[in-house]
Every structure is written in C-alpha cells, then in structure tokens.
C-alpha cells in the first residue's frame, strides 16, 4: 500500500501553535529550539528537527504537542518504535489530541497491528471529521482485519471529504474487489445450490466469453426455484453469441412473459433484429429502452455491442445518425454507441436519491414493471434503512439496472444481513461491487496519471480480473511515463499473452530482456510465452533461469517446467516439477495434469487421488480466478 504522506503539513500547524499562541512567556532558548526545529522541518531535515524537538521535550515534558511533533519526526525518519512511544506519551497528557492519535493509528497500520490502530484512528476521525487521512487510515485498518464493509464506509467518507485524492479512490476500488471475494466465499459455503450463485457463476463465464460454460450455468440456475430477474434475458445474450438466434429469441420472450418491463430482454431483441439485418426494428427497440431508462442503456450499451460484426455496428450508427438528424431519436442515444464520455451526455446520470416521497414509493412496483428503473430506485432509496425485504429486493434490482450501483450496494448490504435473503443480497452486492471497483480504479488512474506505480498496480488488478484490454492500457500508461519499467513490461507481456496476443507479448518480452537479461520474472514470462507457442525446447532455458524468482511466482514456474517436460516425453521429471506446484493450484488444472501423467506411467491410485482433488477444487472455484479453469490451461475458444 502507498504510504500516507501528510506529516509535514500537520507538523507545521503544531509548530505555529506552539510559537504563536500556547506559551508566549517561554525563555529565548526554548523559543530558539522551536524556531530551529521549524526551520529544519521546512527544509526536510527531519533528523535535525527531531533532535531539536527532543531537547524541547526535555525542557518541557508537560507539553503534549512537543511530544507529538517529536513523534512525527521519528515517523518521517522511519523510527517506528520511537514514534509510537512519543505519540503514546502525548496522548496520555492530552487524550483527544488529533495528531498523535492519527499518526499512532497510521504507525500501527504500517506495522499491520490493525486492531490496535482502530481506536486511535476513530478518535482522530471524531476529533476532526473533515480530515480525509483519518478516514483513509481507518479504512486501511478495517481492511486489515477483514471487515471490508466498514473499510468501504471509511473510504467513502474520505472520498466525500477529498474527492480528488487518488489514494482514496485506489483503496476504495481494492476494497470493493475484496468484498467480491469475501461474498464469493460465503456464497460457496452456504448457498452453493442457490439459483443466485449459479446465475453469478454464469454471468462471470459470460463476461469471460466462456459461452459454453455460461450456458450450462444459466440452465442450471433456471432449473432452480428462484433466480435473479433477467436471467432468461442474460442467457439469451449468451445464445446470441453462440449464434443460436432462435433459442435466444425464445429466452428473451420468456423473460418478457414473466417480466414485461425487462429492458434487458428488449435490448436482447434489438440485438437479434440487428443480427438478422432488421436495423430499423433494432433501433426502435433501442429507442424504447432509452426512453424508459437512459441509465439502463448507458450501463448496457457496451454489452449490446460486444461481439457484433463491424459492418453491423456501422449500419446501426448510420441509422441512429439519420434518426437523430430527423429528430426521431435524441442525440445522447447515438453518443452511447459511440463511446462518448459520460460527462458529455446531456441527460443526467442516476445518483443516489435523498429526499423521501411516499407517493412515489407506493408506485415503485409500477415503475419497475414499466422499465422505469431510475424512478423505481429514486422512489425507494430514501427509505432504504427501513424498507421490508420485498421492497429491498425491488430497490436492489432497480438501482443496479439503472446504473445506480452505489445504492444497489447499500441495499444489498441490508439484504445480506438476513439469513432469509443472504444469497440474493450477496448476488447484488457482488454485481454492484464489481462495477464500483472498476469505476473507482479508473478514477484513481485519472487523478494520479503521472504515477507509473499506480498504473502498474491497476494493471495487475485488471489482469487478475481478466480485464485484459484495461490491464494493457494501464501498463502502457506506465511505460509512457517510464519506458524501461520492468514491472510494467512484465505485466504487459502477461496481459497480452492472456488476451491471445502472443506475437505482441513475445515482442514486448524480448525487448524487456535486452535490457534485463537476468531478470527472473522476465525470463519466466518469456518461458510462458514460448510454451504458449509450443516452443517447449526454447522455453526450458528461460524457465530454468527464472527459478530464483519471487516466492509468489515459484509454483507457477515449476508448473510451466512440468509442462515442458511432459511435452518433451520426460514424464518423471514432469511429475517432480508439478508436485512442487500443487500447493498453489487454485483452479484444479495442475492436479488434473499430474493425474494424466500418473496414468501414463501406470500409477492409477495416484491418478485417481489427483483427479479427485482437481474435481473438488473445481467445485469450490467460484472466484474469478477459478471460474476460468478448464481441463487444460485456458478456456477453450468458443
């Protein structure tokens, strides 16, 4: 995590207080010590400033602000234990003093003593509610103890105070992703046979273009007693991508039969019309969805366009432009399909509602049935904390579908708090947290566009989520700022490889290795690229050179070496390498590979055991990393 860097400005305010207000009758020697401390501090000489403060504390041990400033100098020079001692002494003299509480909490966060940090950071936040750093530190402490929801609340408060702080946006985005993982664990443990879990699994497969697996998961979800609204429509989109248009039409119409206001089904029919060359009919459906709820279409226009042939998109654009010129459709409708940034739309994007209106609330169900999701959300959101479960379900649905993911997330939290609606609540919390994470991380990137480190961190997160184009974009931003950054080159090569751009990945890895021929991580990625190109003989040397890589990459390198040996008929060596990778098998494919090798040498008992473990890991694999697993190394093309 990136270190909070506000100590100098806080110190300065205390020095001014000491010099100008608190102790006007001090001897000249004492005043000189404080002035010297301030001067050293202003020029960044924290060692010297600390020595002056130490002498001042010796002269006046009863002044808590002096001890606080001494602690800050220790903090700035990395003397953590001395800083903690000084802050504690200041707090004993004046328990509510803001600075020592804040920085003692920050020190404990830095040392991963999160439970000790929380009370100090809470006290700092209470004594100075407008300080973003107190809320940011508190969020980090809550995240450290695994209380992701409280962490998110603290980050949101920090964001309200300082919306231009890239650190806050970054931590908020990461916290949302951690909430997704936490929800996945609960869903897997308590609700693995729920229609909401199967629908979530299907949604994830669909996002990864694993349409065969998505179809199976949607069918399973639809066979259960309850499942999310629009599941038939979502299944229809998968069938469109598999070019089964008649079955897709059946699913869209089935959705409309039970859910007449489904804009997702309407959008699906628009996609069907376009696939069949019925452009005017497609535009009518799109215009109808936009009229009902612009926020819905803004959130789903990219989904509508995904996988469409370029010529069909061109024809759609032509007809939309003609209708816009004639006044038949609004200007913003065309903008949605041209990827115009939201800040250039003329219609107002949905926001979290505030004012209560009981007459609107009574009409929420009617709004939903008409596809007016934003109006439905606005009607219910002001009473979120008092709504009964039936209305919470409706609010979560309407808020998410209208693109108001902040409200959807808060509503889902309430649903998840009850055992009767936990699975449904976690479904909506996961869906909305994914969207919120993407938005927060993108905002962090915009605000701190000059930081290669942040772009690399964002690239890593996108790559882990299998959002490879976004990952590539972040790595390239980092390389624009620092062309020889090894971390960016490493991440970019992996993202390109995972996205099927093997030649470009090879080009990037080769360029990186020219400057860093002995870098173990770059050698590892070069070995992986050559494995993907079936150049196992070429890969072997690079992989052996990468065996002194970071511990977190160690199992993966052994798994790749195992693959090299297996493909070059060195079965025993392959088994030995794969054994070293088994402990890190998150999706079951390494156990599957070693099981096949055991069969090859006639060891059926070991093979059966490895197959059993592979199956168990697969069944448990709800997280994004596990969802992508197939009985080979990658999802098969579909």
Language-model segments: what does each one mean?
Residues 30, 64-65, 98-99, 132-133, ...:
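Helix-start (N-cap) detector for alpha-helical repeat units in TPR-like alpha-solenoids
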Residues 41, 68, 75, 92, ...:
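Position-specific recognition of the canonical hydrophobic site in helix A of tetratricopeptide repeat
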Residues 59, 93, 127, 161, ...:
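Structural marker of alpha-solenoid helical repeat scaffolds
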Residues 69, 103, 137, 171, ...:
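Canonical tetratricopeptide repeat
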Residues 156-162, 170-178, 190-191, 267, ...:
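TPR/TPR-like (Sel1-like) alpha-helical repeat modules
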